[in-house]
């Protein structure tokens, strides 16, 4: 089967199989701010501050920098991401490394390294698939754990009169070393709202099913992320 078709079917299946139980769960609010600085044509740095509740975690604050390296943009990707302010979207391949300090009340602080490899695939009719492969390498004063996350996103820019917004759906399963299995699945439905040339909002709904512990945990989040984009390219 075509890998693109497999991706679309996977996202649709995961939403249909876990969407109904989500209605019975409480909803939490997850804020986030990412500030991006384009250094040159192939390097970009950003600082992220996020209320991190991934994989069944309690209320946590995650903050830290990342550095991205990407290849030259493809014409097809540039054409379908014209109105998206994220400069990495037109790149077929993006390498990233980051550090996060993760803190929570009553818990040991976590030092996390985040190596990431992301692929972008242009589709017909203006659709874009993003395949993000990320590892979370977590150290505390007492232990080391790791997990692997694979986030598949399907999006398309839509014109509403003269304004262009970008709705999307996504699925992200986690393999957690401490449970020795694929223990968590996150499902997303959201929309990106560009505002001017430096600001973009990401408003989304997230349903998480965590089978790492018994009984299973199901969490629903409403997320609001603020993305700020600046270019230092050519400045002294």
Describe each PLM feature range:
Residues 49-55, 99-105, 121, 135-139, ...:
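Transmembrane beta-strands of outer-membrane beta-barrel pores
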Residues 25-90:
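Start-of-domain marker
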Residues 27-29, 59-63, 109-113, 144-150, ...:
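Residues that define the transmembrane beta-barrel architecture of outer-membrane proteins
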Residues 8-19:
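Bacterial N-terminal signal peptides
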Residues 68-70, 74, 117, 218-236:
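Outer-membrane beta-barrel "beta-signal"
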Residues 41-47, 74-78, 92-95, 124-129, ...:
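Repeated loop/turn-to-beta-strand initiation elements of outer-membrane beta-barrel proteins
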């Amino acid at each position: 089967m075509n890998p693109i078709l497999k991706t679309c079917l996977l996202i649709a299946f995961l939403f249909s199989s876990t969407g109904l139980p989500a209605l019975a769960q409480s909803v939490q609010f997850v804020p986030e701010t990412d500030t991006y600085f384009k250094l040159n044509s192939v390097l970009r740095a950003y600082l992220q501050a996020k209320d991190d509740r991934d994989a069944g975690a309690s209320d946590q604050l995650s903050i830290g920098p990342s550095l991205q390296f990407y290849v030259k943009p493809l014409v097809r990707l540039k054409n379908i991401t014209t109105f998206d302010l994220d400069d990495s979207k037109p790149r077929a391949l993006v390498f990233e490394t980051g550090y996060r300090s993760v803190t929570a009340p009553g818990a040991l602080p976590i030092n996390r390294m985040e190596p990431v490899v992301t692929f972008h695939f242009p589709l017909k009719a203006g659709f874009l698939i993003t395949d993000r492969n990320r590892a979370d390498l977590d150290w505390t004063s007492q232990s080391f754990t790791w997990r692997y996350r694979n986030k598949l996103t399907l999006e398309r820019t839509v014109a509403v009169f003269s304004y262009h917004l970008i709705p999307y759906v996504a699925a992200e399963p986690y393999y957690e070393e401490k449970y020795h299995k694929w223990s968590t699945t996150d499902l997303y439905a959201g929309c990106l709202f560009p505002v001017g040339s430096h600001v973009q909002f990401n408003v989304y709904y997230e349903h998480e099913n965590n089978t790492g512990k018994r009984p299973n945990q199901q969490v629903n989040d409403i997320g609001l992320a603020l993305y700020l984009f600046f270019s230092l390219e050519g400045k002294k």
